[in-house]
Amino acid sequence: VFLRVYGGPHVQYVQRRWDERWGLFDQVMAQRGYVVYSLDNRGSDRRGVAFESPIHRNMGGPEVEDQMVGVRWLKEQPWVDPQRIGVFGWSY
């Protein structure tokens, strides 16, 4: 599994549409047997001030906690080798 992270602020990764920026990468990785996993943590866009504001002057806390919830969920899945979870992404 590749965990793609973007800690914020702004941007919404998870959408119900083809993503021109990452769609081809995700498709190639899937064809090679990998899963690319993304979640929108607190601080990401389009969910209102209450969802976006927790990282204001508090970066490195709430968004990391949210990503770790995702990692724990991934480790419980039968199709995931918990010893082979990588992370990539960018932000502040």
What do these predicted ranges mean?
Residues 1-92:
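Serine-hydrolase catalytic core recognition
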